[in-house]
């Protein structure tokens, strides 16, 4: 595996080939605040699979670096590596995990196709996965006036908004510096430009937020059905039945992201959609969810400090030695904590020219 990663960095194309070997450990390239990455990480936790995780920092534009673009020409996280197989895009990764690890010790998150629950789970999974989460995310940054109680600090929102325009020029520069990846960089540049034209359109954002409410109405009705089907002494059900399924993965991570963006009160606050509110509160207490995603909405712990540590480690001279480097990291962590409300995030983001969040 190490050899294959060296090849990726050297420009040798990576191939997806051969049957999956369940004995080979999984490697996941992800970013903590990536919505798609969060779904994959929750699935891995629910299935109790051993996985080596590597952060690909979006604030530091590591997903645009040549080695990663050779791993996934779209330049997007997550990416799963399993032996000789490289799987990109969250839905494909989740399907791969569900279809590959079939032993009795590994929990199944999708009912058998002949089961009465299969159509229900498949419907809600597809419905929830069709939501334009990237548009909600970018939209709340570009139009924070549409959010309430957003967990993204105001200074970070301002900083990110001012840097979004730099992404195109960064990709153009990388395309010029890496001729073998020029086509991939140009394609990503075009996709990003097209997205931003929509995401900066406040009418479009209001439209998709209204459509989101219709989807959540369906979910609320389905949760009510589960409550009516369950005897008082029975186990509390999930979205499609007694078992936690891929539909629940999609719903749980969606609600957590909406809470982070500042769309919770609009969609399940003040007694609106009470079943949805109860469901989300229950999800927060689920052991696997709490382990994987319990801290991600705290931007200090999940983004600012890890980025600070990464920058400090990269910039610390090798002659300092490991002990002093660790001391610097601890000191920076304390410094970050004390100055978080005084715009530490802006300082960290400013350490690298032209960062982007896409």
Swiss-Prot record:
Subcellular location: Mitochondrion outer membrane; Cytoplasm
A single GO BP: mitochondrial fusion
Annotated stretches, region: Required for mitochondrial localization: 320-358
InterPro entries referenced in this protein's UniProt entry, alphabetically: Glutathione-S-Trfase_C-like, Glutathione-S-Trfase_C_sf, Glutathione_S-Trfase, Glutathione_S-Trfase_N, GST_C_GDAP1, Thioredoxin-like_sf
Keyword Flavoprotein carried by entry: no
Summary of the tissues where the protein is detected: Expressed in brain, spinal cord, muscles and intestinal villi. In the central nervous system expressed most prominently in the cortex, cerebellum, thalamus, olfactory bulb, and spinal cord. Expressed also in sciatic nerves and in dorsal root ganglia.
Naturally occurring in which organism (per UniProt): Mus musculus
Keyword Acetylation: yes
Descriptive protein name: Ganglioside-induced differentiation-associated protein 1
Protein function: Regulates the mitochondrial network by promoting mitochondrial fission.
Pfam family, one: GST_N_3
Transmembrane feature ranges: 292-312, 320-340
Family: Belongs to the GST superfamily.
Modification comment: Ubiquitinated by PRKN during mitophagy, leading to its degradation and enhancement of mitophagy. Deubiquitinated by USP30.
Record-linked CDD domains: GST_C_GDAP1, GST_N_GDAP1
Modified residues (N6-acetyllysine): 203
GO cellular component, one term: cytosol
Covalent crosslink: Glycyl lysine isopeptide (Lys-Gly) (interchain with G-Cter in ubiquitin): 50, 172-173, 188, 190, 203, 206-207, 214
Boundaries of every GST C-terminal domain copy: 153-309
Keywords: Acetylation, Coiled coil, Cytoplasm, Isopeptide bond, Membrane, Mitochondrion, Mitochondrion outer membrane, Transmembrane, Transmembrane helix, Ubl conjugation
Boundaries of every GST N-terminal domain copy: 24-105
Membrane topology: Multi-pass membrane protein
Induction and repression of expression: Increased expression during neural differentiation.
Subunit text: Homodimer.
Domain of life: Eukaryota
Cysteine pairings via disulfide bonds: none
